[in-house]
Design a protein with these regions (language model features):
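Solvent-exposed interaction patches of small proteins and small membrane subunits
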Residues: 1-131
Length: 131
């Protein structure tokens, strides 16, 4: 995956990840901040699966959905807990298509406790591949 496109994609993911880090490290979010944190999660999600898509293409595999991208990452050893990533797909789809305050708070806790650490882990692994 040592292509300029893949490197740029990973840099974009890193910027979104830094923004998400600020959101998950802040206690007691207002409703607006909660919505912003979820939006940052959605950015990270989109940028990551697109980065994985580029990585797969560099190895000759065509990926067209986030589910395929995360399955590819699991097969490539970039992620361990495939269920976490499948849960992430469901939560991301829920936040994009509907907004409910109670669900938003639930998804935020998932982001903070499960998804953000998973993003950090895969970022490190992808960074190592590019060096």
């Amino acid at each position: 995956m040592k292509t300029k496109t893949a490197q740029q994609s990973l840099e974009n993911f890193k910027r979104a990840l830094d923004s998400l880090k600020n959101a998950v490290s802040k206690p007691n979010l207002s409703e607006l901040e909660l919505a912003g944190a979820i939006q940052n999660f959605e950015f990270c999600y989109e940028l990551l699966w697109k980065t994985l898509q580029k990585h797969a293409a560099a190895s000759g595999r065509r990926i067209v959905t986030p589910r395929e991208a995360f399955q590819f990452a699991h097969q490539a050893g970039l992620i361990q807990d495939e269920k976490l990533w499948l849960d992430m797909i469901e939560d991301r789809n829920e936040t994009v298509h509907t907004y409910d305050q109670t669900n938003a708070e639930h998804v935020y806790q998932e982001i903070k406790n499960r998804y953000f650490p998973a993003f950090l882990d895969i970022f490190k692994k992808l960074s190592d591949l590019l060096s």
